[in-house]
């Protein structure tokens, strides 16, 4: 009897839903994208067991390393549903790199984690290309990452992203709350849109209100609603880093989850309070649209969305003009939005009647 007829079936990884060759093809496709992010200290070649970075080659003398990691939240679900994958990588880098600059740190290198049920190289390449673009905007090298193909873990077409960024700052240049003082001025840098927070509410509104995402936005007929919502998060690193090195910036707050109310207090000492005047900048039309569609109260706006301010910059009154001019010279839109005063650590946002669709003068407060 031929023994081969009695032998058990031979299983392969591919039969289980994982294609090693597809993964290898992806690495070959994205390697040039990573190499394009090279910077002093990193060669950004992929394929090894780990990535190297030379702090001395990057020009640091007595640095502290600063690390951050984040994701894109449920904005990713909207990207998957709409087939718009070419901006979420910028979002991913922005959420990490902007968190580093608020410590005074220069982003140095980035790693990503891409997980999916079945690898689609066209989608994955588009995502990694946008991560590489984000790294260029932040001035950091894409030195590695992980692509995980996990059958049964995700629905068809779904994927998840996580980013990890490491930066460095000279020991004597770390931004802490120690420099913030009563009388300091709060400048706001304009956001590029919703950024990457509040999308669970955005998606709920889209479903409940029956938005036609592929149609021109009601507030701007020149742009599709989906494009307005998916605008990548602005990366502020290159605009802020030179000013951080001058010592003129006392503190920075990245306006993410928790909005203005909860993020500004994170950079204040226990004895100081931030006062923000919502009348000092015009509410972006996209934010006004979201508020009107959801009948959202001003306080809820101030703790859910960035409301048009992606980064808060705290400076001394004497440096307001110089810092504003320097930021505007590199393309930032700058508003004087508030001040720091003595009081319990926290933030109060106030507005007059009609500001943010209010029916009367209003005030929203959060104590940290």
Curated annotation (Swiss-Prot):
This is Phosphoribosylformylglycinamidine cyclo-ligase. Disulfide bonds: none annotated. Its main location: cytoplasm. It catalyses: 2-formamido-N(1)-(5-O-phospho-beta-D-ribosyl)acetamidine + ATP = 5-amino-1-(5-phospho-beta-D-ribosyl)imidazole + ADP + phosphate + H(+). It is an enzyme of class 6 (ligase). The keyword Transcription regulation does not apply. PANTHER family: TRIFUNCTIONAL PURINE BIOSYNTHETIC PROTEIN ADENOSINE-3, TRIFUNCTIONAL PURINE BIOSYNTHETIC PROTEIN ADENOSINE-3-RELATED. Belongs to the AIR synthase family. Keywords: ATP-binding, Cytoplasm, Ligase, Nucleotide-binding, Purine biosynthesis. The keyword Cytoplasm applies. It comes from Sphingopyxis alaskensis (strain DSM 13593 / LMG 18877 / RB2256) (Sphingomonas alaskensis). Its EC number is 6.3.3.1. One of its GO terms (molecular function) is phosphoribosylamine-glycine ligase activity. One of its GO terms (biological process) is 'de novo' IMP biosynthetic process. One of its GO terms (cellular component) is cytosol. It holds the Pfam family AIRS_C. It is found in: Cytoplasm. Pathway: Purine metabolism; IMP biosynthesis via de novo pathway; 5-amino-1-(5-phospho-D-ribosyl)imidazole from N(2)-formyl-N(1)-(5-phospho-D-ribosyl)glycinamide: step 2/2.
């Amino acid at each position: 009897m031929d023994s081969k007829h009695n032998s058990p079936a031979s299983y392969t990884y591919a039969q289980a839903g994982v294609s090693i060759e597809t993964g290898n093809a992806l690495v070959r496709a994205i390697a040039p994208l990573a190499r394009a992010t090279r910077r002093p200290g990193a060669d950004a070649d992929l394929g090894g067991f780990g990535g190297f970075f030379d702090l001395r080659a990057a020009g640091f003398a007595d640095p502290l390393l600063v690390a951050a990691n984040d994701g894109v939240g449920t904005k990713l679900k909207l990207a998957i549903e709409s087939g718009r994958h070419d901006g979420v990588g910028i979002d991913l880098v922005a959420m990490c790199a902007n968190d580093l600059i608020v410590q005074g740190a220069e982003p140095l290198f980035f790693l990503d984690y891409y997980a999916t049920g079945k690898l689609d190289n066209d989608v994955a390449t588009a995502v990694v290309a946008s991560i590489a673009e984000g790294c260029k905007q932040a001035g950091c090298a894409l030195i590695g990452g992980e692509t995980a193909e996990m059958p049964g873990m995700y629905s068809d077409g779904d994927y998840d992203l996580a980013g990890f960024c490491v930066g460095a700052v000279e020991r004597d240049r770390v931004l802490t709350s120690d420099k913030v003082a009563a009388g300091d001025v709060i400048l706001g840098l304009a956001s590029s849109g919703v950024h990457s927070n509040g999308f669970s509410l955005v998606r709920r509104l889209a479903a409940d209100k029956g938005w036609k995402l592929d149609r021109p936005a009601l507030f701007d007929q020149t742009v599709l609603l989906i494009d307005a919502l998916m605008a990548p998060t602005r990366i502020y690193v290159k605009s802020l880093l030179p000013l951080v090195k001058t010592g003129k910036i006392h503190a920075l707050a990245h306006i993410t989850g928790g909005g203005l109310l909860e993020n500004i207090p994170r950079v204040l000492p226990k004895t100081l309070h931030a006062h923000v005047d919502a009348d000092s900048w015009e509410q972006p039309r996209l934010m006004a649209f979201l508020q009107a569609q959801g009948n959202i109260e001003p306080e809820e706006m101030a703790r859910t969305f960035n409301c048009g301010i992606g980064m808060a910059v705290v400076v001394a009154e004497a440096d307001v003009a110089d810092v504003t001019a320097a930021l505007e010279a590199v393309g930032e839109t700058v508003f004087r939005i508030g001040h720091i005063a003595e009081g319990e650590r926290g933030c109060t946002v106030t507005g007059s009647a009609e500001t943010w669709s209010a029916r009367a003068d209003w005030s929203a407060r959060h104590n940290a």
